[in-house]
């Protein structure tokens, strides 16, 4: 809808690591993409706990992964033994 009115989009990605991957792909495909806002602490410290290949910004730019799907390599050890790990971060 924004594109139809010549308005830029600026996704904010403060959700989980899969949202970060989806937003990177959205920004790559959107002709009216302006900027993607993300949280340094999350992609630098939290997302690597869940994902093997978190795209790290280089000189302010993120390259969307070219792997199948959204390109996320979820760590298989998170699903072993049926144990869920919960960590309070705030």
Predicted regions and their residues:
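Shared catalytic-loop signature of beta/alpha-barrel
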Residues: 1-61, 65
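C-terminal extensions of enzymes
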Residues: 50-90
């Amino acid at each position: 809808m924004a594109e139809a009115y010549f308005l830029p989009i600026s996704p904010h990605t403060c959700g989980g690591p899969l949202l970060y991957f989806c937003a990177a792909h959205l920004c790559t495909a959107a002709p009216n993409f302006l900027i993607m806002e993300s949280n340094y602490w999350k992609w630098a410290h939290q997302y690597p706990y869940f994902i093997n290949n978190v795209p790290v910004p280089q000189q302010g730019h993120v390259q969307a992964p070219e792997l199948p799907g959204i390109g996320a390599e979820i760590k298989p050890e998170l699903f072993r033994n049926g144990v869920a790990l919960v960590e309070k971060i705030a």
